[in-house]
Amino acid sequence: SHTMPAEDTVLQARWVAGQYGYTVNYYQQNVDGSENYTLKESVHQTAAMDSVIEPELKQYTGFTAPEKAKQIIVTTDERANVADYYYTRNKYSLSWDLDGGMAVAGYTEGQVYYDTPIIAPAAVKDGNSCVWNMKIEQNMPAKDLAYKAVWTPQSYQLTMEPNGGYVTGDGELLTKTVTYGTAYDTLPKLEKEGYTFAGWYSEQEGGTEITSETLVTATGDHTIYARFIPINYKIDYYGADGA
């Protein structure tokens, strides 16, 4: 309380602006690239009545911010003191170099939205196993990606079926390891009484001839077969008188 002085007094009111809340909502475009957006975060602050607020434009990896900041003129109605920012999702390039291999369609490629789950191609190539030149990301990062298949030729067990023949000279009759796309290398020569060795073949009958220079095209363990040609003998008969 104050005591009235013995003279006229003039009092002046002093007003302080009230503080009212405002909200800034940050929305991000959905990963499917549709026109739907999901709220990433909301920021709640207060400011004086009639203040003009220009909320911060945040930066989010993989998204493009709106071109201009919005303004909020603070009023007593906090429900109206709202600014909504919508961020579009960026696209990045994703490519797969199969390097001579093949893959069934359905894998992720082309221009891909940020954070999209990546489905890698199931790459196949006869006689080879595949790895990629770098680790495959689970989701699309905020950068372009270019993968390349690295193929490794497979090795298989080769069995030699002698068909009654036996080894002469260099070489052994055994099971050996051969590699797809490379030559069979040294193959033994065989002998068989009454026959001439005609080489190794891919089938017991028919098939194709397999030499040391033949490239392996089989895609698994396999057998080659020795083939022989009967020797024809000329028999002359003589009578008792030598005629």
Protein language model regions, located:
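Secondary-structure capping and domain/repeat boundary segments
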Residues: 1-243
